[in-house]
Every structure is written in structure tokens, then in C-alpha cells.
């Protein structure tokens, strides 16, 4: 959305092994529908420019391939490619939006600064909070990737950085903003009310799955 204030969906998760993933997510086969809503994920990060550079290396570009019917000749289908963003978390996993992967034939993921694409699989999935976890079975992919830690929630007036892949671009973008509003709003996929953050500042039109980073103690 090309508004000065862009809405960002908030999701809180724990990296603790005592909290099983299945408590938050459903199987990928339960819900499969696509949405044009560009959602975002909130986590905390570190304060210096060098720390933002480290965080940038954890952000990946996701390529989703699907088949869509021809409206004129519905017996024919066409393969479509979509791209979005995600980021590495603990356990060799990628966190992104559910609507990014909800109707895919196959997925590929590319690291920042690399031309190589790696096959990815959906490991956990839930439209209620519009989040999905991907797995990548490649030792090479996980080399030199420092996963991000999911931390607390930023407050109004605090600085955040939006990292992702804007539409029409193939390189990662970093945008600085200020949290200007926090309020519950309906998610476009489930119509469930959850907290949504508004950040002010100059923003690009981001692909889904981007990360917004609060500057705080390496999270």
C-alpha cells in the first residue's frame, strides 16, 4: 500500500523448545487460498548500522510457483511465479506469511547476495495469524546465516527498520520508520482481530513477509 503510514501485522512467538510449533499452526492442507494483503512480521533487532547489516543477511527472498486457470479457456492452466520475503529463525527455519505459500506448487528461497535458489517446504502453517514456517534441507544454504531472535513488541514513538523486497526490485530494501499507532484490526485472511502497527515515514511497496525490526539488545 502506498500510504505514508503502512500497517504492519504483529505476531508474538517464542523460540523456547518448550513451546511446540503445532500449538500455533495448522497443517498446510487445511487452508489454501491467496490474498493480496501485504502483511509484515514484527521482531526486535539491534541498534547500530552494522547490526542492521547482520539482520539483512537473515532476510531471504521467497519464490512461490502456482498454476492458475485461464479465465477464457478454463481447461487450460498457466504457471505463475510470485515473490515475497521471509527471515531465518532458530532451528533452521524460515518465517514468512501464510498467504505467501498457501496455494503453491513448489517454493524456492534465495539468500541475500546470492544467485542460488534452494528448494523449500512448508513445515507449519496457519491463516489465523497469517504465518508459515519453511524448512530448507541444504547445508550450503544455512552456512553464514545468523537466525534472528523473536523479541518483544515495539511501542509508539520507537524506531523500527523495515527489511524486505519491494515490488519491481530484486535487491533488499531497508526503510527506517517510527511506530505511530498500535491498535487491533481484522486480518484480511481470517477476519480475526489482532494487533496491527502503523509506522510513519517514507516507505516502499513491500512484498509480503517482510520483517520490521525494533532496535533492542540484538533482537
From Swiss-Prot:
Active site: 99, 130, 208
One Pfam family matching this protein: Trypsin_2
Region entry Serine protease, spans: 61-216
Superkingdom as given in the UniProt entry: Eukaryota
Keywords: Chloroplast, Hydrolase, Plastid, Protease, Serine protease, Transit peptide
GO BP terms, alphabetized: proteolysis
Listed GO MF terms: serine-type peptidase activity
Cellular localisation: Plastid, Chloroplast
Transit peptide interval: 1-45
Transmembrane region(s): none
InterPro entries per record: Peptidase_S1_PA
EC identifiers of the protein: 3.4.21.-
GO cellular component, one term: chloroplast
Family: Belongs to the peptidase S1B family.
Function: Putative serine protease.
Stated name of the protein: Putative protease Do-like 6, chloroplastic
Origin species: Arabidopsis thaliana (Mouse-ear cress)
Underlying gene: DEGP6
Amino acid at each position: 500500500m502506498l500510504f505514508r503510514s503502512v500497517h504492519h501485522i504483529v505476531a508474538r512467538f517464542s523460540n523456547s523448545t518448550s513451546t511446540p510449533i503445532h500449538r500455533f499452526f495448522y497443517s498446510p492442507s487445511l487452508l489454501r487460498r491467496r490474498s493480496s494483503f501485504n502483511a509484515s512480521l514484527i521482531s526486535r533487532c539491534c541498534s547500530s548500522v552494522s547490526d542492521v547489516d547482520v539482520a539483512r543477511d537473515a532476510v531471504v527472498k521467497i519464490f512461490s510457483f502456482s498454476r492458475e486457470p485461464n479465465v477464457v479457456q478454463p481447461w487450460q492452466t498457466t504457471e505463475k511465479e510470485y515473490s515475497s520475503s521471509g527471515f531465518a529463525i532458530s532451528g533452521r527455519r524460515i518465517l514468512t506469511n501464510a498467504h505467501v505459500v498457501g496455494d503453491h506448487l513448489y517454493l524456492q528461497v534465495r539468500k541475500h547476495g546470492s544467485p542460488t535458489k534452494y528448494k523449500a517446504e512448508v513445515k507449519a502453517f496457519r491463516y489465523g495469524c497469517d504465518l508459515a514456517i519453511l524448512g530448507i534441507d541444504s547445508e550450503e544454504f544455512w552456512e553464514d546465516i545468523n537466525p534472528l531472535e523473536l523479541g518483544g513488541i515495539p511501542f509508539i514513538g520507537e524506531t523500527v527498520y523495515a527489511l524486505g523486497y519491494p515490488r519491481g526490485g530484486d535487491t533488499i530494501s531497508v526503510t527506517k520508520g517510527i511506530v505511530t499507532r498500535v491498535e487491533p484490526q481484522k486480518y484480511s485472511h481470517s477476519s480475526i482481530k489482532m494487533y496491527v502497527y502503523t509506522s510513519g515515514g517514507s516507505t516502499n511497496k513491500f512484498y509480503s513477509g517482510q520483517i520490521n525490526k525494533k532496535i533492542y539488545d540484538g533482537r
